[in-house]
Amino acid sequence: MDNREQAAVVARAANNGDATIAVSLGEPSMEPEVWRKDIRRAKERIGRGQILIVSVIGTPVPGGDAETLIADYADCAGWAAESGADAIEVHLATPDPFVEQTQMIYENVPLAARILHRTRTTVTVPVLAKLGPFKTPRLLHETATRLAAWAHGYVLVHSISRRVFDDKGAPAFDGAGRERADVVGAQTFTVASRQVAEMLAWRKAGAWDRAVLAVGGISTVERARDVLREGADAVLVATAALYDPLFAARFRQIRTAAVA
């Protein structure tokens, strides 16, 4: 994928370590009882020293207001914690359904704060706020500062929103409202790692002491090591694991060998 400033052009081939994909799936979910069972099964299978972070998102309903959405976030978080989650990731990098002009929930700081507050007062496990990219370092600082009271840490960057076209210049996804999609994978690293570095710089300056979990374009072990050396508390991968399910195992092997 050729990832440009305002658009991305889809390519059909990808090699391990450089895969970048566009995602336009909406926000589908199985019924709560189904994914609660998945969480329990996952918790039973994790090993010593591992933790299970469960990401939750509220579902807007036709005619629903902010309170309805906030309550759904909290309900999902409570069910996830009851099912065995060691930490809750509150997914705020999703469209804000209460505004006409496109923005994400994390950009609506009062709404994001209410969601985090309700979640934090619902569960006893750590709460992480998942964020997307910010237009300026100042916006990042102001948002993180205002949300810090209700979050144990931040996870960023979820994805990069772009208009996506095929190699003939036509929209890559059929249907109204799908001109823009979430771009994830290797080529988002430049943007995502810069956002993480800015978050770490504000923390080092004493703005707040919350954990910073890096995600976005971390497609190689070398990138993971670099981000951790910069000060991130943890590295998360998603697209990389689709192409390399043993990514984490290889990371641990290389780190162990380096120490030895």
Regions found by a protein language model. Give the residues of each.
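C-terminal helical cap(s) of enzyme catalytic domains, especially alpha/beta-barrels
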Residues: 1-12, 164-181, 228-229, 234, ...
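Active-site entrance/lid segments in N-terminal catalytic domains of soluble metabolic enzymes
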Residues: 1-146, 172-174
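Electropositive phosphate-/nucleotide-binding environments in soluble metabolic enzymes
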Residues: 29-33, 70, 186-193, 221, ...
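Short helix-capping segments at alpha-helix termini
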Residues: 45-47, 121-125, 149, 203-208, ...
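Catalytic cores of alpha/beta
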Residues: 68-71, 75, 135-149, 201-205, ...
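Glycine/Thr-rich beta-alpha phosphate-binding loop at enzyme active sites
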Residues: 92-107, 143-210, 250
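Glycine-rich phosphate-binding active-site loops on the catalytic face of alpha/beta enzymes
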Residues: 92-94, 150-163, 217-218, 224-251
